[in-house]
């Protein structure tokens, strides 16, 4: 009986699918769960196909928005808003209050999460009159407003379409601004809403944190005792939002955000695959990723992170100033780029002349040592 000849391409595809299933089972990820996430999560075209790319390693820009609206621009339910303790739905704007660059090497070595202080005074790109100076967090909102104004002048658009196109302009501007500031490629992006932090903590049944001192803050609603404690969803959001009453203000808040992520990863690791369905539901409603990201490949890369192989670092600032009544961070762009280059491209850096020493930040601007993702760190 003649042997059936299967086209090589089909063999390759079939083999890849089988290998994928085996790997995902080994990683504790159900194929149905992956399919649900891959088909349900929102996608963005903010990163152009011809944009600069990393070689081998991957850089992912994570943006956390302040908006109190959902992905369609609709107000969140009143019950959720009251739990957020973040004011009415028209507050918050579209600032990217959380900016973090995830660098995942392709050799299995330690990954890094670089927090970019939101008030860094830098050149904004992708906004009217660019490049103009402003807080790095503002690129998203400025571009969104300008694009919606331009579209309205061209004719009627539905509110949902305006929201989508405005946000796409905001994402492009924020990515371009961070790319220019750090001088590294941005391969992928992930955007998380304010409510996303709340729903994430809820899906995990609370998040354990540790604070060095008891804190109470009426602005964020944070009310914590000293030491380790498990926070519900509302308390967890207050924990990552608080900056008033903290010695280093925004820098301490940045460290809290890092500690929150480390704790979330610690709990996901502990819960295993049982946590996945709830997390997928949260992602589908509160997360936007770029079209080019392959979630299966990303999940495999991220398996290193949930194993504790991730270090957090906050990029340096020089000092703070007050301009027009607002506090801004003055930064040395060349110094920041040297710090980033040492993490993102160490082999290339070693072949060049040694970089100049990076002066320490002022004492009042220096946070404690950064957390790692294999424990629950104590923070201020």
Model feature map: region roles:
Residues 2-380:
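Non-catalytic, solvent-exposed segments at the cell envelope interface
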């Amino acid at each position: 009986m003649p042997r059936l000849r299967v086209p090589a391409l089909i063999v390759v595809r079939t083999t890849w699918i089988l290998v994928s299933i085996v790997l995902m089972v080994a990683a504790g990820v159900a194929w149905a769960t992956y399919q649900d996430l891959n088909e349900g999560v929102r996608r963005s075209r903010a990163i152009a196909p011809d944009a600069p790319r990393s070689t081998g390693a991957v850089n992912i820009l994570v943006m956390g928005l302040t908006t109190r609206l959902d992905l369609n621009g609709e107000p969140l339910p009143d019950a959720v808003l009251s739990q957020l303790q973040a004011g009415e739905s028209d507050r918050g704007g579209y600032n990217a209050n959380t900016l973090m660059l995830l660098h995942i090497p392709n050799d299995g070595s330690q990954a890094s999460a670089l927090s970019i202080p939101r008030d860094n005074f830098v050149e904004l790109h992708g906004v009217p009159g660019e490049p103009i100076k402003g807080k790095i967090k503002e690129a998203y909102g400025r571009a969104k407003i300008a694009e919606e104004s331009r579209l309205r002048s061209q004719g009627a658009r539905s509110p949902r379409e305006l929201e989508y196109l405005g946000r796409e302009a905001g994402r492009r501007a924020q990515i371009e601004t961070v790319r220019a500031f750090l001088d590294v490629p941005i391969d992928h992006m992930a955007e998380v809403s304010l409510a996303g932090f709340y729903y994430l903590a809820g899906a995990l049944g609370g998040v354990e944190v540790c604070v060095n001192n008891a804190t109470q803050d009426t602005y964020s609603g944070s009310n914590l005792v000293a030491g380790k404690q498990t926070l519900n969803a509302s308390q967890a959001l207050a924990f990552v939002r608080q900056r008033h009453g903290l010695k280093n203000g925004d820098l301490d808040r940045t460290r809290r955000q890092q500690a929150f992520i480390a704790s979330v990863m610690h709990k996901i690791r502990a819960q295993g695959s049982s946590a996945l369905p709830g997390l997928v539901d949260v992602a589908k409603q509160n997360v936007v990723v770029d079209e080019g990201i392959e979630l299966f490949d990303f999940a495999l890369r991220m398996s290193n992170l949930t194993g504790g192989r991730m270090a957090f670092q906050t990029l340096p600032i020089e000092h703070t100033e007050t301009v027009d009544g607002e506090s801004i961070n003055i930064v040395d762009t060349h110094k920041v780029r040297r710090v980033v280059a040492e993490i993102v491209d160490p082999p290339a850096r070693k072949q060049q002349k040694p970089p100049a020493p990076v002066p320490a930040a002022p004492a009042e601007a220096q946070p404690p040592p950064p957390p790692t993702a294999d424990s629950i760190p104590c923070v201020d």
